[in-house]
């Protein structure tokens, strides 16, 4: 690495925290003249090394404001999470690969904050022992950085005694309690959780919400009362809720999404046992993702392709080599223990709630013996109703609209590869992302509008001359609000034949489903459909 390049590099580690078993951090890095192509985190311990993939290219407008001359400053953010094979990690190094192929190592060991949890409670050790022999092995990390500062870092700690003395009296005096488990990563699952809590409170039911908090590597317990008020506590483990489950009038356990939970297989085993120990508490398992089937909860394999849940022997060879960032949200594991323990959890549920029939079919591929009478299909309610339909001109050059927060699994690389082809082949096509794109793309044919409100959609479509929509997701989404909104705009849509969106668009007359999952196929389908629509608008 040349001396000037090292000297001119700018970076910041906003937070890097470890609890001994897990690492999480975020920051930014950029150079005045050279683009950074890839970032990784190298861990060194006593007799071991590990390379963690880093999600690089996140939007950082704060960095761009302070360092406007740095190349790609606005997309210089990174986030990383993962599990060291053993404790402790003595050295942590950021590995940077530049666009010219050069490589630079930055020692960031000094930035690590340690959050040692001390000895675990005897009850937790028992649960860990029951799962002995396992090697425990997750839209989207997008939004963690944005929300991290809003987290309640100073929430008081709550051990088992405190749970009884401080929390239980208020819960035990009420008529009913719903205990909800969910991740804290944002997105549709969290929106659904908020609606669920509001419904329960409106019915006079108190709610205890347990989430995992990545920025601090611990759990949060939030207690909501129907009369109002909210209390927030830190807990070292979900096992701290056992006194509440044992003594409070728990009528419902609602498993929304445990993606990112510290010990996912221990959690699955524990939930099944809690349901057996408390038969009056109804257990609902909501399938917002495919976490119960695989740590790659978006069902993309180690090569980044949709897998469709193949034979478990294929999964056994895929999972050990899977390097995706979302898989790193879970500890290393094997597919056998994963399916066995999550299968037990699903079997214990009174209701396995799917939001599309596509989800039900895929889940049954992983668990063909799951009782059919316990699986429900309840699509989400979509409130979006446009005030009017957008006016579009199909005789004008093709302008492709992409709506939403487009991460890699939602098709960011498809958009990037399409733009590469458009630029390389000098095609008269523009792409407008109404929302955000999670990968940096430099093209004069691209415009990214940034965040939007639903009531702005029609105006943004018209102002940008959009005349065709693309839904580029490369994973089988369990439900898609964006797809429903696109249909209500009555615009032509191109998408891949995957998941709930594929099922929904197959019955929509203005949709075209691509022959294969690739940028080339998407672009060809868009061009073909645009030509057909343009021909229909030509005067006879």
Indicate residue ranges for each PLM-predicted region:
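A conserved mid-protein helix/loop that constitutes part of the nucleotide-sugar donor-binding site
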Residues: 191-195, 407-421
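Nucleotide-activated donor-binding/catalytic signature segment of Leloir-type glycosyltransferases, i.e.
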Residues: 435-464, 513
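Membrane-proximal helix-turn-helix segments that form the acceptor-binding/catalytic region
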Residues: 308-352
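Nucleotide-sugar-dependent
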Residues: 469-481, 502-503
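Short hydrophobic beta-strand element within catalytic cores of glycosyltransferases
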Residues: 468-469, 492-495
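Basic, ligand-binding patches in group-transfer machinery
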Residues: 1-170
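Conserved donor-binding/catalytic core segment of Leloir-type glycosyltransferases
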Residues: 353, 393-410, 419
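Helix-loop-beta element that forms the nucleotide-linked donor phosphate-binding surface
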Residues: 344, 348, 360-382
